[in-house]
Amino acid sequence: MNKTTLLYTGKAKQVYATDDPDVLWMAYTNQATALNGEKKAQIAHKGELNRAISTLLFKELTAVGIPTHYLDSPDSTTMIVKKAAMLPLEVVVRNYASGHFVTKFNVKPMMKLDPPIHEYYYKSDELGDPFMNEAQIFALHEATPEQLKQVRALTDRINTYLMQRFAAIGITLVDFKLEYGTLKDGTLVLADELSPDNFRLVDQQTGASLDKDVFRQNRGPLTPVYEEVLSRLQEKGAAHV
């Protein structure tokens, strides 16, 4: 498998075409961004750590029947994935109140949200990723009712698995972001990445952040935090879920 044309440069990844028209080459970079890209820095080993965490979790979710775009990880910063037409939506799941949800609704931080909340955001840096409700999604033809039904069902299954997975290693999954796409045969798959860049994680013993909030809020070096998450996931495998 060889990469060819650079198709897209994102905040933390570069995506290339390959000599297989149905397969993409995803390169994880060391760039960290926050505040809609206003804050940027190069973080040592971040690409390797996010690739490793994403690979581990994609493999586990695939093993429990979640359709994903994952195919292979040939080196420390590369992921080979199925080519998917991405839905222009960020799916946010909130298990506990945190971030702007706290200020928006004037609730206590870490209040448990039962049932978990699904939110949808239109994926557009230019527009600041605005919130979308289901009526807006359908009216603008960003996803079909059947696709969104599948998204909700898959997201609930993924959330249940990940909450248990992280709880088993002493981490609370506060909230997280997912992205989905469709393969050329129409199959809806989980795509993008699964890492502390997209998860809000809190240590159950200390209350410390174990995610990109450390960078966003200038709480210290980010690399050791991501190393800790990976180490715990590797130490206790999926059998503990």
Curated annotation (Swiss-Prot):
Top EC group: ligase
Record key words, sorted: ATP-binding, Ligase, Nucleotide-binding, Purine biosynthesis
InterPro entries, A to Z: SAICAR_synt/ADE2_N, SAICAR_synt_PurC, SAICAR_synth, SAICAR_synthetase
Domain of life: Bacteria
Pathway(s) per entry: Purine metabolism; IMP biosynthesis via de novo pathway; 5-amino-1-(5-phospho-D-ribosyl)imidazole-4-carboxamide from 5-amino-1-(5-phospho-D-ribosyl)imidazole-4-carboxylate: step 1/2
Signal peptide (from-to): none
EC number: 6.3.2.6
Catalytic activity: 5-amino-1-(5-phospho-D-ribosyl)imidazole-4-carboxylate + L-aspartate + ATP = (2S)-2-[5-amino-1-(5-phospho-beta-D-ribosyl)imidazole-4-carboxamido]succinate + ADP + phosphate + 2 H(+)
UniProt record, GO biological process: 'de novo' IMP biosynthetic process; cobalamin biosynthetic process
GO molecular function term, any single one: phosphoribosylaminoimidazolesuccinocarboxamide synthase activity
PANTHER family for this protein: MULTIFUNCTIONAL PROTEIN ADE2, SI:DKEY-6E2.2
Family named by the database record: Belongs to the SAICAR synthetase family.
HAMAP family (alphabetical): SAICAR_synth (MF_00137)
Protein name: Phosphoribosylaminoimidazole-succinocarboxamide synthase
UniProt gene name: purC
